Amino acid sequence: MNTRLRGLQASDGQLPLSAPHWLTERAFRQGDIPAVRRFTQAFGARRGIRSARLADFVLAVSEAAACATAVGPCTARVRLWVTGSRAFCEVRGNGMLLRRSARGDGRVRAGGIPGEEEAMRRLVLKQLSDYVSVASGPDGVCVLLSMRVA
């Protein structure tokens, strides 16, 4: 299976992708976040990730999935893999997380105001992950994260 991240440049903060040992992916919608958590839990258990780190990874993936689907009905895809002692997650959704304000003075949520929930999700992601990137553009939202699991 091809594990390259399409559409990313080196300057976009692309995660290292050397020979993943496990790769799995799943499509989901906003209401499927509990299923994404179960999917991640099963992935981590099969990979042998320690219980405490697995709980952190499941929470981080759940928050990444929530970020990608936060603004309403959209479809998204979560990809999970392990390389060496690190677990990686990529979540891509076709919704718009952020848009430019009419005055061009900053980015705001698609609903028009900065979201406290979004800020909290990003804080949780930053605290749990060794690396996290959240990007929104015309093609949707992309969340990348990695954490040491061994």
Name the predicted role of every residue range.
Residues G44, A60, A65, A87-C89:
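Small side chains
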Residues R37, V61-S62, E118:
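Generic non-transmembrane alpha-helix signal with a bias for helix starts/N-cap capping motifs
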Residues M1-R26, T69-A150:
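Conserved beta-strand-loop-beta-strand hairpin that lines the nucleotide-binding pocket
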Residues M1-V58:
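Bergerat-fold GHKL ATPase/HATPase_c domain
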Residues T40, A65, R122:
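Generic structural marker for isolated residues within well-ordered, non-membrane alpha-helices
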Residues S51-A76:
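Conserved ATP-binding N-box helix of the HATPase_c
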